[in-house]
Amino acid sequence: MPVDAWIREEIEIPEGVEVSVQDYNVKVKGPKGEVEKKLFWPGVKIFVEDGKVVIYKDFPRRKDVAIVRTFKAHINNMIKGVTEGFTYKLKVVYSHFPITVKVQGDEVIIENFLGEKAPRRAKILPGVTVKVKGQEIIVEGIDKEATGQTAANIEQATRITKWDRRVFQDGIYIVEKAGKPITF
């Protein structure tokens, strides 16, 4: 099997975005804010050159190639986050007991889920905003991981176990990620 001498992936830095790399910390600044992430793998070099972010590895093995391309995807997501942002839409679904959802500090409070007296809580990660409009919840942020995890926390807070999901369909469900509808 032929072996490549190196792998080099390049990412164009769009106008209005500033990328800096220092001690494996990649910092991306843009019109919506700033995202920082530590990207380390032995032998992988990340640097900025001629308006591009370059990810480089000498004599890569299969795992090294996968890591380089993963780092490229992470940096692309960081650039997209500071320019466009990420949005998740969730829908509140209930059949009998009306669910009340409100944001309080860094938590989403879900009341009267299946008639329960105690409210359920979902954590909102730093840098993420949650808005409740009727039966729709909108989660927005510039960090894809934090935004997605917050949406997942809200969905998981209403997960039903030990009951037939075909009958008991109450809950909060992600219906749209980054402008693309989710099909069930």
From Swiss-Prot:
Gene Ontology terms describing biological process: cytoplasmic translation
Pfam families recorded: Ribosomal_L6
InterPro entries per record: Ribosomal_uL6-like, Ribosomal_uL6-like_a/b-dom_sf, Ribosomal_uL6_a/b-dom, Ribosomal_uL6_arc, Ribosomal_uL6_CS2
Keyword set, alphabetical order: Ribonucleoprotein, Ribosomal protein, RNA-binding, rRNA-binding
Alphabetized GO MF terms: rRNA binding; structural constituent of ribosome
Keyword rRNA-binding: yes
GO cellular component annotations of the record: cytosolic large ribosomal subunit
Xref: SUPFAM superfamilies: Ribosomal protein L6 (SSF56053)
Disulphide bond pairs: none
Keyword Thylakoid in annotation: no
Its job: This protein binds to the 23S rRNA, and is important in its secondary structure. It is located near the subunit interface in the base of the L7/L12 stalk, and near the tRNA binding site of the peptidyltransferase center.
Quaternary structure note: Part of the 50S ribosomal subunit.
Family designation: Belongs to the universal ribosomal protein uL6 family.
Protein name: Large ribosomal subunit protein uL6
Organism: Pyrococcus horikoshii (strain ATCC 700860 / DSM 12428 / JCM 9974 / NBRC 100139 / OT-3)
Organism placement in taxonomy: Archaea, Methanobacteriati, Methanobacteriota, Thermococci, Thermococcales
